[in-house]
């Protein structure tokens, strides 16, 4: 993996972290209906899983 590809993946990880943080803040505000909060919690979990998968790819490719 070249450095440009690595930077692209690291940027994606950062973007996912920012999105997950924004979603978590919205869930914590508790201003939405329960069904919407449940959906947002699911989105947050999916974002976290995606971040972990990308981090694993980066780790494997930089060995």
Question: What is each residue range found by the language model?
Answer:
Residues 21-63:
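Short, charge-rich amphipathic interface segments used for partner binding and complex assembly
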Residues 12, 16-23:
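Charged/polar low-complexity intrinsically disordered segments, enriched in acidic residues
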Residues 1-14:
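Short, charge/polar-rich alpha-helical segments
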């Amino acid at each position: 993996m070249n450095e440009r590809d690595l930077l692209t993946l690291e940027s994606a990880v950062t973007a996912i972290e920012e999105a997950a943080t924004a979603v978590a803040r919205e869930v914590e505000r508790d201003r939405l209906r329960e069904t919407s909060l449940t959906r947002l919690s699911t989105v947050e979990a999916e974002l976290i899983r995606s971040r972990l998968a990308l981090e694993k790819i980066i780790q494997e490719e930089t060995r």
